[in-house]
Amino acid sequence: MPRSLFRTVLTALVAASCLIAAPALAKSRIKDIVSFEGVRENQLIGYGIVVGLNGTGDSLRNAPMTKQSLEAMLERQGVNVRDNNLNTKNTAAVMVTANLPPFSASGSKVDVTVSTLGDAKSLLGGTLLVTSLQGADGQTYAVAQGTVQTGSVSAGGASGSSVTKGVPTAGRIAGGGVIERETGFQMVNMDIMRLTLRNPDFTTARRVADAINAKFPGCAQAQNPTIIATRPPPGMDMISFMTNIENLMVEPDGPAKVVIDEVAGVIVMGDDVRISQVAIAQGNLTITVQENPAVSQPAPFSQGQTAVVPQSTVNVEEEKGKQLLTLGGAPSLKGLIGGLNALGVTPRDMISILQAVKAAGALQADIEVM
């Protein structure tokens, strides 16, 4: 093989090996880490009635609004029931909620959530009657109706015992809401579009602005850790501009954080969590108190009385074999977890240890307790 060809092949192999060994950067698309100004959902809410329940509806004593609503609805249908006794066991008053998607067109459908308002036991098999859904401005944007799907199962026996799986007092209607009014938001004539970072950070904001300016010079500026102001270049409308920039790749950054759920015993921490040099010792102390009541029997013919004498036994056990663990300065997440696992700690013990390390000033991260 000629020397020049050998040198070329060797150079190519070395370059390929470097590319394979190089760690991949955790980059994300801009549209996955920001929200566009005005492009958001709006919450809708309404009050309605579910009928067709199998005796699991509201009672007249605890839910008088159900009877009033039923009477008003029947009167609108031309039925006079003011002087008659109504049974609401097959009817339930409910609150209906939905999210109005951005740019939703009139006639499109959305899912709605139905939740009981009174003391109804279940919405299984019920049908929601026509219900208007209003926005925060009081305007009606959608109308909902349909069969409620609860996703729950109930079973009972003749003795009165029953088993319920799921939540039967709340359900959904897939495509049960029809959009009647549009929000009227338009992007075509906008001059400036502000991008809002979902996780505010100075570094990420600058990187987003740099990525946009690399493709469209002078069209983006980071105003603060949350907002990046953008302007389309001359001759380009806002829709085309957003289409071009939303798929640009950016490596997001953020402060080191440890999230703790004390109820479930869950700990979530990022790879950028660092810890200063610190020594950790952990031991479990178990205290057992056992009651052993004894009977005191008097001697014969002594005119004494039999009595119960309480006797308590207290045992204190401390787990042996635990060592003092020393973590060097700024170890990685792998080293931190490996060191804590070396102590044999459980996730719940690890929560207390991390909080103690943070209190000692050795944990270089924020702790967020859920």
UniProtKB/Swiss-Prot annotation:
List the molecular function annotations (GO) for this entry.
structural molecule activity
Q: What residue range is the signal peptide?
A: 1-26
Primary location group: periplasm
Q: Which pairs are disulfide-linked?
A: none
Tell me, what is an example of a GO biological process annotation in this record?
bacterial-type flagellum-dependent cell motility
Keywords of the record = Bacterial flagellum, Periplasm, Signal
Any idea where this protein resides?
Periplasm; Bacterial flagellum basal body
CC terms in the record's Gene Ontology section: bacterial-type flagellum basal body, distal rod, P ring; outer membrane-bounded periplasmic space
Highest taxon listed in the record's lineage: Bacteria
On subunit structure and binding partners, the annotation says: The basal body constitutes a major portion of the flagellar organelle and consists of five rings (E,L,P,S, and M) mounted on a central rod.
UniProt function note: Assembles around the rod to form the L-ring and probably protects the motor/basal body from shearing forces during rotation.
Q: Which family does it belong to?
A: Belongs to the FlgI family.
Name under which the protein is recorded: Flagellar P-ring protein
Source organism per UniProt? Caulobacter vibrioides (strain ATCC 19089 / CIP 103742 / CB 15)
